[in-house]
């Protein structure tokens, strides 16, 4: 079932799953990340740590997107207001270029 909260996430090419978090709680999940409380906790901690790396003093979050790249997949993290959107996306293999 698609809700307004997740409809954009479900259209991302090569996505393997997603999480929508608010204050560490899972609001929505799907695919490989469905009901993954451990991933939600780790990502919440990662976002909190990244927010501590402010170069300029201010109340704004110091980043818009955060990518954690693994061998076969990438976790794409976007913070919007009080929500954290996480998408697990399959990395595409690059074809060799013939010269």
Swiss-Prot record:
Any coiled-coil regions, as ranges: none
Q: Name one GO cellular component term.
A: late endosome membrane
State the InterPro entries in the record: LAMTOR4
Where are residues bearing N-acetylmethionine located in the sequence?
1
Q: What post-translational modification information does the record give?
A: Phosphorylation at Ser-67 by PKA inhibits Ragulator complex assembly.
Q: Where in the cell is it found?
A: Lysosome
Briefly, what is this protein's role?
A: As part of the Ragulator complex it is involved in amino acid sensing and activation of mTORC1, a signaling complex promoting cell growth in response to growth factors, energy levels, and amino acids. Activated by amino acids through a mechanism involving the lysosomal V-ATPase, the Ragulator plays a dual role for the small GTPases Rag (RagA/RRAGA, RagB/RRAGB, RagC/RRAGC and/or RagD/RRAGD): it (1) acts as a guanine nucleotide exchange factor (GEF), activating the small GTPases Rag and (2) mediates recruitment of Rag GTPases to the lysosome membrane.
Any transmembrane segments, and where?
A: none
The alphabetized UniProt keywords are: Acetylation, Lysosome, Phosphoprotein
Q: Subunit comment for this entry?
A: Part of the Ragulator complex composed of LAMTOR1, LAMTOR2, LAMTOR3, LAMTOR4 and LAMTOR5. LAMTOR4 and LAMTOR5 form a heterodimer that interacts, through LAMTOR1, with a LAMTOR2, LAMTOR3 heterodimer. The Ragulator complex interacts with both the mTORC1 complex and heterodimers constituted of the Rag GTPases RagA/RRAGA, RagB/RRAGB, RagC/RRAGC and RagD/RRAGD; regulated by amino acid availability. The Ragulator complex interacts with SLC38A9; the probable amino acid sensor.
Q: Name one GO biological process term.
A: cellular response to amino acid stimulus
Q: State a single Gene Ontology molecular function.
A: molecular adaptor activity
- Post-translational modification N-acetylthreonine, affected residues: 2
For this entry, the protein name equals Ragulator complex protein LAMTOR4
| Keyword Acetylation included in the entry's annotation | yes
Q: Which residues carry this modification: Phosphoserine?
A: 67
Q: Which family does it belong to?
A: Belongs to the LAMTOR4 family.
